[in-house]
Structure formats: structure tokens, C-alpha cells
Swiss-Prot record:
SUPFAM superfamilies: Chelatase. This is Coproporphyrin III ferrochelatase. One of its GO terms (molecular function) is ferrochelatase activity. It comes from the Bacteria.
Length: 310
């Protein structure tokens, strides 16, 4: 008898932190019309002629800085999370796929359909946005139109409780001037076209403030990981860090709820590049709240969510 299947999907990673593999990965990622809305006739010459040749080697350096002996941290943590969820759901078939790179969504679903009667897909993006979740939906529906998709979970009480506990534990371990809640940014144009991402991140921030034993005046919200010249959601994290340092707030705690697993953005952009900006402008300590990664609590949350909605 066939089982039910659960597919956990994250963004993806190059196969190796080498320039050719990073170039292939970036080409796939930056060719997605949900990510880059510019007409392909204008965008592709720019991508192939300027961006990939100049950005690939630089990004490869950043990937090498955070690569582990087991591989890409994003892939490793997602694999471990799958194993833990599988242990909690032995009656299900639990797999993982990546939006870009490997394992591909289409290949994984094709394999799952051989042993699964129904497939539920959970993109590991708490907040819905066209540039991440919609691409997963498109690829899943191409592979299995009948698959059920849980397209967001940032408003789930258990998720907010879990995230707040993670933040509070980190806050209580140190002495900080500010808590910065930093979400992955998206172009402002996407929000103007109806993307719900900003509303969802602002709602999550409000819910976290209610749950945290931290004075609201010590909490700020920001957006990070801006790409390209177009305006993205503000305030930018890097500018916020610079301002906090100049105000004499020398010790900050940063949490990045958009990233459920440690990846290039948390390990390199935040802990290295943003930390350097903060220190160079008078800051002292920048500490990251650990991502949920493969924690037993996060695995249990996913299990409960899927059994309730899957």
C-alpha cells in the first residue's frame, strides 16, 4: 500500500564552492522570472555578459568561507531536518528538494510518486513571496498537479512561540543594546504589485514583540541581502547597523527569520560582512541568533503542521 509523502523544499546551493558550479547555480537562480521581473531580452545579455562573469568568482569565495566538511550548510541542515522529521513520521515518506540546484523538485517528485499516493509540499520559507514560494509552487504543479502545498507558516502560533523562545534564550545569554530582526529583502516593486511579503514580516515582528521579554524600544526591524540597483524594502540591515554603531549601541543581537537553516546569508553576509561594517563604525559585538536548522523543536513543529494541514 502506498504511503503519504512529504517534500521539504529549500532554496538551493551550488554543488561545490567552485566558480564554475557557482556560475551554473547563479545562472539558474537569476534566470527565474519570479526573481528577476525584467524582460529576458534585456536581462539575459546583462546576466550573461556582466553579472555572471564578475559575480561568480566573488560568490564562490563567499561559499568557500562557509562550506563545511560535509558540504553546503543549507543542504546539510536540510538533510538532517528531513531525517528527524522522518523519525517523527515513520508512516510517511519524507524527502527534500531544492528550488535551484540539486536535488531537483521534478526529479524528487517523480521518484516519490512511485511509492506515495499523496504528496504534501512544504517550502521552508516562513513568509510567502513570489520570488521564493511561487517558484516552488510552479515547479511542483508542473511535476504533480495534485500535490498539496502549505505555502507559508509565519503566522502559526507554534512557529512564533518557537522563534521567540530561540531569540529570548540568545538575548538572556548576553548584554545587548538592540535586537535587530532582519528579513531577506525583496524589490519594492514586488510589494507594489501586490506581494504580501512586507505585510507578513511586519505582522511576524509585531507578534514576536508581544512574546519577547525585551523592551520594544530595543527592537528594530530591517531587511538584508539586497541585489542590484533597484530599491528594495527598507530599512536595509547594513545601514541600520551603521546607524546603531554611530549612536553608541555597541552590542547587538541579530535574528534572521527568513532563513530557517544557516546559509550564505547568515554565515557569510551577516556574521562576516555585516559584522565588519558594524565594527568599522564603532560597534563591538554582533551576535546571531542560531537558525532553527535541524533542531528537534523545529522538526516537531513541521510534523505537527503537516499532520494538521497535509
Amino acid at each position: 500500500m502506498k504511503k503519504n509523502g512529504l517534500l521539504l523544499v529549500n532554496l538551493g546551493s551550488p554543488d561545490t564552492p567552485t566558480t564554475p558550479d557557482v556560475k551554473r547555480y547563479l545562472k539558474e537562480f537569476l534566470s527565474d522570472r519570479n526573481v528577476i521581473e525584467m524582460p529576458p531580452a534585456l536581462w539575459q545579455p546583462l546576466l550573461r555578459g556582466i553579472i555572471l562573469p564578475t559575480r561568480s568568482w566573488r560568490s564562490a569565495t563567499f561559499y568557500r568561507n562557509c562550506w563545511t566538511k560535509d558540504g553546503s550548510p543549507l543542504i546539510v541542515y536540510t538533510e538532517r531536518l528531513v531525517a528527524k522529521v522522518q523519525g517523527l513520521m515513520p508512516e510517511w515518506v519524507v524527502k527534500m528538494a531544492m528550488t535551484y540546484g540539486k536535488p531537483k523538485i521534478s526529479d524528487t517528485i517523480t521518484g516519490m510518486k512511485k511509492e506515495c499516493q499523496n504528496i504534501t509540499v512544504l517550502p521552508l520559507f516562513p513568509f510567502f513571496t513570489k520570488s521564493t514560494t511561487q517558484t516552488v509552487i510552479d515547479k511542483v504543479k508542473d511535476a504533480d498537479p495534485e500535490a498539496k502545498i502549505i505555502d507559508r507558516f509565519s503566522a502559526e502560533e507554534d512557529y512564533l512561540d518557537l522563534l521567540a523562545k530561540q531569540i529570548q534564550t540568545a538575548w538572556d545569554r548576553g548584554k545587548y543594546d538592540k535586537l535587530l530582526i532582519s528579513y531577506h529583502g525583496i524589490p519594492t516593486a514586488m510589494v507594489n504589485h501586490g506581494d504580501p511579503y512586507r505585510d507578513e514580516t511586519e505582522a511576524a515582528t509585531a507578534e514576536l514583540i508581544k512574546r519577547l521579554d525585551i523592551p520594544e524600544k530595543q527592537i528594530k526591524m530591517a531587511y538584508q541581502s539586497k541585489f542590484g540597483p533597484m530599491p528594495w524594502l527598507k530599512p536595509y540591515l547594513r545601514n541600520t547597523l551603521l546607524n546603531e554603531a554611530q549612536l553608541g549601541h555597541r552590542d547587538v543581537l541579530v535574528v534572521a527569520p527568513s532563513f530557517v537553516a544557516d546559509c550564505l546569508e547568515t554565515l557569510e553576509e551577516d556574521q562576516v560582512q555585516n559584522y565588519q561594517v558594524f565594527r568599522e563604525n564603532g560597534g563591538n559585538n554582533l551576535v546571531m541568533v542560531p537558525s532553527l536548522n535541524d533542531s528537534p523543536e523545529f522538526a516537531q513543529f513541521i510534523t505537527d503542521l503537516v499532520q494538521r494541514k497535509g
